């Protein structure tokens, strides 16, 4: 895709539940982006991501919320099977995927507990808020660990990541279903502003051309939302009187 036609999708939650899910998803993406830890800088980047993930996780009962939502979605899809002109094979496949994800999540140990109880993570986490607080004399355990064979660190990293797979798979299945519940529609904003109403919307998705160098600021809730478009260059950038973009309310 050329730079002229490449697009950016901005997502905005319309309730606190979705806000929490998106933050956890973002943390999981960061954690899984690490293929190896081979330096102090990569180690600190990983441990900061772990620390943020633990904090987000501690703000709610994520397992109970996800299991409840997965069950709700399965029941709704079961009703679809009785509708005419529905692709029963696809719907049944989605139901099975949600069911398997829910089963794995319900059987998994307490989410994130293996991270909270890990000695290295605990030691580093305590020092992250201190500027320059992870020198070798501050955390000699980390210094030793970073000088062990790469295979040892990779094995540990894999263990940390795999312990989150039940949560990751369940969340991915749910968010994919939500994102696919509505299609993008072309609309126009006037003088950099757009507003609309929705019935029980959970997630707002806004698609803009990257070349426009414009981003949205969203305010709203499940029934109504407003979007203000702003230029990346706050001093010299401008917003056209009519701005075409695409929107999806899931």
Swiss-Prot record:
Recorded superkingdom: Bacteria
Chief localization: cytoplasm
Subunit text: Interacts with FtsZ.
Entry keyword annotation includes Cytoplasm: yes
PANTHER family referenced in this protein's UniProt entry, alphabetically: CELL DIVISION PROTEIN ZAPD (PTHR39455:SF1)
Localization: Cytoplasm
Similarity remark: Belongs to the ZapD family.
GO CC list: cell division site; cytoplasm
Xref: InterPro entries: ZapD (IPR009777), ZapD_C (IPR027462), ZapD_sf (IPR036268)
Functional note: Cell division factor that enhances FtsZ-ring assembly. Directly interacts with FtsZ and promotes bundling of FtsZ protofilaments, with a reduction in FtsZ GTPase activity.
Pfam families: ZapD
Transcription keyword on record: no
One example of a Gene Ontology biological process annotation: division septum assembly
Source species: Proteus mirabilis (strain HI4320)
Sorted UniProt keywords: Cell cycle, Cell division, Cytoplasm, Septation
Protein name: Cell division protein ZapD
């Amino acid at each position: 895709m050329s730079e002229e036609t490449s697009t950016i999708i901005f997502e905005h939650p319309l309730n606190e539940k979705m806000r929490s899910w998106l933050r956890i998803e973002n943390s999981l993406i960061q954690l899984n982006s690490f293929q190896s830890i081979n330096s102090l800088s990569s180690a600190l980047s990983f441990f900061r991501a772990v620390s943020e993930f633990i904090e987000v996780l501690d703000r709610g009962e994520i397992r109970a919320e996800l299991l409840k939502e997965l069950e709700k979605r399965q029941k709704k899809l079961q009703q679809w099977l009785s509708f005419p002109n529905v692709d029963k094979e696809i719907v049944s496949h989605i139901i099975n995927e949600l069911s398997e994800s829910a089963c794995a999540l319900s059987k998994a140990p307490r989410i994130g507990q293996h991270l909270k109880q890990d000695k290295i993570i605990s030691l580093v986490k305590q020092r992250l808020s201190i500027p320059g607080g992870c020198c070798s004399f501050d955390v000699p355990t980390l210094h030793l660990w970073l000088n062990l064979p790469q295979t040892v660190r990779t094995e540990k990293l894999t263990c940390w990541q795999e312990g989150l797979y039940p949560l990751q798979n369940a969340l991915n299945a749910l968010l994919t279903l939500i994102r696919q519940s509505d299609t993008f529609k072309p609309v126009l904003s006037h003088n950099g502003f757009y507003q609309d109403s929705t019935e029980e919307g959970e997630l707002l998705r806004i698609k803009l051309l990257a070349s426009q160098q414009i981003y949205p600021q969203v305010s709203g809730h499940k029934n109504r939302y407003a979007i203000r478009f702003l230029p990346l260059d706050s001093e010299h950038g401008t917003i056209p009187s009519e701005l075409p973009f695409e929107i999806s309310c899931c």
